[in-house]
Amino acid sequence: MNPSPPSDSLTANDRPSSQTSGTIEIISVTTAAEQELFLEVPAIVYANDPNWVPPLRSSIAKQFASDNPFLQYGKFQQFIAVGDSSLVTGHSSLAANNGQRTTDNGQSKIQNLKSQIPLGRIVASVNQRLIDREGAAIGLFGFFECVSDFRVAEALFDAACQWLKAQGMTKVRGPIDFSTHNNCLLLVDGFDSPPMVMMPYNPSYYPEFMERDGWHKAKDAYAYNFPLDRPLPEEFEKAYRVAVKSGVTFRPLNIKGEAFEQDCISLYNLFTKAFSNNWSSTPRTLEEFLEEARSLQSLVDPDVFPVAEYEGEMIGFWMGLPDYNIPLKRVNGKLNWLGILKFLWYKRQIDQGRVIAICSLPEYRRKMVPLALIYLGMMGGIKKGKPYKRAELSWVYEDNFPSRKLIEASGGKIYKTYRIYEKELG
């Protein structure tokens, strides 16, 4: 937990509510017990939502550890909202259990929590790299979750904004978990299906709460659906043949040993050239990029991660991942020995994937490299032992017209819309 200036807890019992009565208290997270409450919030919010995929608790907790590289150039403060069990009616069985949370085997985990039920959470953060890049005192909020009571959301937003204002920020942007390289975006359309791997999901009432609290749209992003249960357009294969004839070679990403490290260095160089000017993006060092790549190494499937080379230099890639949310949903946020067995068993059911990025250097696009990569990436999914039925291409900013044109011309259709919000700090 990141320390913050001493402050009293905030109460929101006098705020107007369209939902319930009861006292809401905002607490700055500073203890291990409060961190546990912070981590429990999603399980309460999404208890009755069939589309929610529980994140690994360990992966969330790790982001607040004292050795997080983010702390070298940023700072943050976690907040939780707590209240009595009447405020979680309709979200979980907590109210029926008289405010006691239980483990999977029904044993009481924490007693006498009638006034300490976690109702929501938020993290306010200051990313100095973002401030330096944009030349403005822009703070961030992220990790936001809350039950369907507007008072809870309002109190959490107030706490985050007050903390950011005390840090000298004049504007807030989010949801962004420390940076856009991490989890970000709020789902505003497309609530009828689960999220793909490493994509956000939230209740449909979040956008309404944001707007009621005075937040406005900063930018939208889209997720495209691309069906694979039909023949691919002939243009894809033709583009692949043209690229090969022009001297471009293609291969799967190396995923082992020194070859993996070397490929990741090439990927970093391409990312830096192609995406460094993306809106709200912040620079990453090579070591930060390699650390993230190593954490994902065991998840990479070379069948859906083709790279393009010209005269020995990597000039493009298609970054695909199997939709690991399918087995992760069965793990329920716990990767213990039983969770690992469940993950490996249900991994065999994966029949779809997500395309995180398509990249080719501009000077090689006339060699049909982008379409050739699409062809190889899609065919890699189609030829799996359990053929992929579809792919999601996400996320693409609304004003990234070159990428949108390429995806839409290839048959992709927008099926989910996400949003980043902003608010001025008066």
Residue ranges: model-predicted function:
Residues 2-19, 84-117:
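Short, basic, low-complexity termini and linkers enriched in Ser/Thr/Gly/Pro
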Residues 42-79, 83, 124-132, 255-259, ...:
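A conserved beta-strand-loop-helix scaffold within acyl/acetyltransferase catalytic domains
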